[in-house]
């Protein structure tokens, strides 16, 4: 208050305020007088008044009211900007200065205190552990912290469950919850010292059936170790741990069902097994105790010396109960730290960097309570050690030994040192003395470590060289020869050299907590130049999609990192890039954390050498362990964009490379399973498309869709109306800068368009698809009934056929035939088989293997598929419950196999005709009826199988459209909520902008999907790609998409108008032949009246797609020469069907196409000269006609295979 005139402490009372008067630094002292005291009181009062004048006799003011500071004239009227110093103390937030005060605007995951001058992190609920302790690696339960669990009695208890769980933020950043449930402490009566050392030394903290098998405590007598697991190395070092291999106990499905002692007591034989070794303890007496202690002490990293704990403010501390440095090492290792320290044997410290205040070793002379060879600090100091990590691997491999030979290095340590110095990541020791350096794990499988001890074996033991990284690869019997993952488990790495990609060409993921690069495919390293062609176009980020904490999300299909500066700002703290392909084409040095998730990453040689992020940048909020296994988190919008791109690429029938790219995109999308419902819905659609592509690749089948020109004309018009409606409102929003009401009005209009137009359009698409589904379902149902009738009729004539067979002298031979025809060769009577001649038996066996089994399989699949599809239809028709696409995805895979069974039907029909054509068989009574019924069953079965395929395809299409509809409904709900918040002033304009942008993005994506469907139909109609102006524009705005729609609308009107010049004629002759004829082309019409049918194949050799129009069928005519009425009726019907499958090639590529079934009926009175001339009865079916009302692609194939039936 200006009262600085006294040398002695002196209390002055100014009104109701008391303060101490003392001398200010740099001022002289003189005795205190009442006058001085009075002046001091006056000056104190004036310093509390912002506008009080300063008298010349007044002592200078030294302080003002909080929030203000002195001007040069002595006034307290100048605002004090608290934010200029240490951000106002707003750690984890931004300081906002106001006149005379300030407040904190907190980052995501932090909430302001009641005074608004601090930001406190969102925390999870505290945890407890019965018979154990729970400690946080951050000293609190703030989000991102880990709860570390330990049991009190570590000598006789073990954790059953995770050793730690993580506190995770919710999507809004307002609450937090634990990633899992707490474990329990389970008692274990058996304990020995070897068990403890074994468990710690060989990463036994995770008892999950991989390193050690769950079900047996790590501190019990017998231990199990899979030979393909991390603990395999102990087999070569058993003596070091004073254990011996004793064989295998009873083993059942990965669970040890008996202890070693029980097996011995029961007299079980202990046999060798390739998958497991059992180790038991040996006597760890006092004589062996020193060896045990040496091993335990070796599990502590290098000592850095003694440091004061006062210089360790940034370190985390934990309670240490057992007084062992080994335990502290394990705590800090699990928490992800590089260094640990022990204070007075009871406190464990963990940190990322060494402390700064080092003292003499004499200040840390106290030894650990239970580890006498290790120093454990004092009351005010701590011994600091590097965290011990067993990075040596020590695994024995076959295969590549390395790219660099080091003759001078003979030992492991020498080899590792040399290889590290030369920049390699692995050191390989062969024959216990030859050193090789490399940057990847060997190409061969891992083998028994004892093989590496054999001179001349050619095997090598592999060690890691760089303590900052840990390499991992795909596990399995055959190790992937290339490294697939490299991660920094210390969290300290903030950059990398791109030379890493060159040395590790198979690298797919690099992970630290500030820099994450992920590629679903192997990273490519070459001079890319223009190797980033926009397969699907460029998808830019959604405008407004960034929050106030500085997180920025960018969406691209193809992105060059040299353009990163255009899309970021100084405000960014974390940048997330989601793309199909990322080109690293320049050095990158940024101050924000960077995460890239792409299907492919390409590094340009000679243009880029390093990627660095700021060491003080914010850590990326993610579970690093999950990233190591599954890659960075997904983004919903990128998943929807990726699916749309894959759909377009999958429809590139003339480009198999694009289809393979589509498959890779879908594979990356579908594995592993996404975390939330919306992402899983998109993932389900991707799974179905992936299965469809798998079927195409496996069976070389391309299903031709069914669309009409009228449908596309309507669809393009509707899409155009939607674009116009959205564009008008968006243009208005762009010019609104101040009026909140105007912004709200236009935003609400966009919401209404979304509800009335976009969602309505999505529902209409679904309804139209359901109409096609119902049409296919009706055909399927009729054919299914006909199939059941045909099967019943076939079984009805079997008794007559049986009696004729049994009446023959050689009845055993015919009994074998009968059992084969009924059930296949597996059911043939053994006695009958024995009496059959070898030649006949061989014929029957061959037919059974290729045909009868196939028919059984077809019938089985049809029966099961009917139930599945019926249930799916019922769910899809629900207007309330969203359709769960996971229920049909697996069945789509079956559809791919159904194409094969169409051919099985045909083969079966031919082979059965061969059997029935045997003179002896055809002479039997009832053989003709049996043959005719069997042939009809095969014809209907073929048509039924095709109908099932068609219906399944319609199911997939309907399910996709239903899922899209559901997603739009959900998006509309979120949009409504955001607008409500904006209306109530609970949310900012940026949030409304973001959700509107997302809405526009989805609509544009759907319209692009319509364009992709149009281009697919165009290809099958014109046999050439659709015009570029009609192709989807994935990176375009609404207006650019509008241009494509307009052109597609014009092109759609011209589709389906060209007729075909090709006609087919099928003639039935020789109508005077016997009624019991076998050759289907030699039978009279009266035979066909008894449900006889036959197949007709259009002869096509080396069909080329360029000859499409030569084989596209305009009409097919069936003639029955000399047809006459029978005794009962004169009506005659001709049924003509085709499977719609054909093969062809284009540019050397072979295609198999499948369209919808063609079916027509021609009916007339055989006595009428108008309907049928006397010399023949004929029916003519129009297959492909001129006119836009016909389905443009329904009859686009030549229909090479026909089934004709006369009734």
Swiss-Prot record:
Record domain WSC: where: 300-391, 392-476
Residues annotated as domain Sushi: 122-187
CDD domains: CCP (cd00033), EGF_CA (cd00054)
Glycan attachment residues as annotated in the record: 745
Molecular-function annotations in GO: calcium channel regulator activity; calcium ion binding; toxin activity
EGF-like domain span: 79-120
A Pfam family the protein falls into: EGF_CA
Tissue expression as described in the entry: Expressed exclusively in the four pharyngeal lobes and in tissue located at the base of the teeth. No distinct expression is visible in the putative venom glands or elsewhere in the pharynx.
GO cellular component: extracellular region; host cell presynaptic membrane
Disulphide bonds in the chain: 83-95, 90-104, 106-119, 124-167, 151-185
Major localization listed first in the record, in broad terms: secreted
Assigned keywords, A-Z: Calcium, Calcium channel impairing toxin, Disulfide bond, EGF-like domain, Glycoprotein, Ion channel impairing toxin, Neurotoxin, Presynaptic neurotoxin, Repeat, Secreted, Sushi, Toxin, Voltage-gated calcium channel impairing toxin
Keyword flag Glycoprotein: yes
Keyword DNA damage: no
Compartment(s): Secreted
Subunit structure comment from the entry: Dimer; probably disulfide-linked. Interacts with Cav2.2/CACNA1B calcium channel.
Comment field (misc): Does not show activity on Cav1 and Cav2.1/CACNA1A calcium channels.
Its biological purpose: Potent venom presynaptic neurotoxin that promotes a long-lasting increase in spontaneous neurotransmitter release at the peripheral and central synapses by selective activation of Cav2.2/CACNA1B (N-type) channels. In addition, it drastically enhances synaptic-vesicle recycling, an effect that is prevented by the Cav2.2-specific inhibitor conotoxin-MVIIA. It activates Cav2.2/CACNA1B by shifting the current-voltage relationship of channels towards more hyperpolarized potentiels in a reversible manner.
Protein name in UniProt: Glycerotoxin paralog 1
